[in-house]
Amino acid sequence: MLETPKVLLKNLQDCKIHFIGIGGIGISGLAKYLKAQGATISGSDIAISPSVKYLKALGVEINIPHDPKAINNQDVIIHSAIIKEDNTEIQRAKELEIPILSRKDALYSILKDKRVFSVCGAHGKSSITAMLSAICPAFGAIIGAHSKEFDSNVRESANDSLVFEADESDSSFLFSNPFCAIVPNTEPEHLEHYDHDLERFFFAYEYFLDHAQKRVIYKEDPFLKNYSKDAIVLEKKDIYNIQYILKDGEPYTSFELKDLGAFLVWGLGEHNATNASLAILSALDELNLEEIRNNLLNFKGIKKRFDILQKNALILIDDYAHHPTEISATLKSARIYADLLDTQEKIVVIWQAHKYSRLMDNLEEFKKCFLEHCDRLIILPVYSASEVKRDIDLKAHFKHYNPTFIDRVRKKGDFLELLVNDNVVETIEKGFVIGFGAGDITYQLRGEM
């Protein structure tokens, strides 16, 4: 059965709202957006983060760490998923009988009166959301990553139209009130939330699509190709004449879409053209075609997605890909980029698996995803994301790559140091290196830890 959200009778934009865990990417996005909508915002977290600094600069009062004294006369408390019932601020809010909403429940109250372009899928949703927000600059945007166009995960706006990155991992996408539902793929993941029931998992996607007034789907997906209700459909054959270029040193994909002409979008790979095409098709009723074509050029990528950190003797790329399908697609992009640069360097991959559950569920696919375009594989310890450690013999499972196992990687100037037991065992001074993972590898590659 599908969950029913807790509903707050008051409009959140008229409320005093306290966010517990305000530094997280999801919660900070809601806080930034609601402040722009007129709400009075306060918050707390356990540590300073870039989002906390940004909100403080806007005048938002934020307590570090959590403090029950911060809870006084607010109309509602919104907390992130990791906040537990025994949190001191949660306990104080209960004493004062202040309504408490999880982020998931708050979504419905925030979005119920909005014209939401809701993007959901296993892969590509951050990119599509950022591309569509570039195409429609008057719309608000809440993205699960930082758009380089406006250097934030949120574009604050008083506009009722909103581009929103929805999340299937906790089924909160069902609370996103989609005016337009945009789905690139439905590859099963996060099945633990759906009790490993595929029927329940796909029913959630069907419900999401059914409740939108407008639907944009990629029909090469095995589930979406059988979706029967009216939808704007993208098929692989609709995208043609794909070419890759460097423009002012930056990578771009050129392609033609249906009978709409040629488009140019930042980034490389067929998947990049597919993501851009879904964003374009979603905007056809919003802007004229030339505005769409020109505005798409404002998309400059998103942080941690084929994020080119440096391009000198050592080309260094950070990518959030943490699923075999994503890794395989991004490695193809890396090979295209290497060819455009006319470098003869081999592609070195540093991989940090994210969550034992994902690694075990997709182990056979992980064992294959590096076969193409990876010349050397370096493996970091699994990033558990608070999961209980599980025994898995990575050396045995990945022996066909003859991988290098290290404890961590450290950025030092323009070089990378590989460490085992806090000893530097190798320094990479030149070449082509791409890091994959959704854990702390991004901070290791950036020299931030």
UniProtKB/Swiss-Prot annotation:
Presence of the UniProt keyword Manganese in the record: no
Keyword annotations from UniProtKB, A to Z: ATP-binding, Cell cycle, Cell division, Cell shape, Cell wall biogenesis/degradation, Cytoplasm, Ligase, Nucleotide-binding, Peptidoglycan synthesis
Source species, domain of life: Bacteria
Subcellular location(s) of the protein: Cytoplasm
GO biological process: cell division; cell wall organization; peptidoglycan biosynthetic process; regulation of cell shape
GO CC, any one term: cytoplasm
Positions of ATP binding: G121, A122, H123, G124, K125, S126, S127
Gene Ontology terms, MF aspect: ATP binding; UDP-N-acetylmuramate-L-alanine ligase activity
Main location: cytoplasm
SUPFAM superfamilies registered for this protein in UniProt: MurCD N-terminal domain (SSF51984), MurD-like peptide ligases, catalytic domain (SSF53623), MurD-like peptide ligases, peptide-binding domain (SSF53244)
Signal peptide: none
Its biological purpose: Cell wall formation.
Name of the protein: UDP-N-acetylmuramate--L-alanine ligase
Organism: Helicobacter pylori (strain P12)
Gene from which this protein is expressed: murC
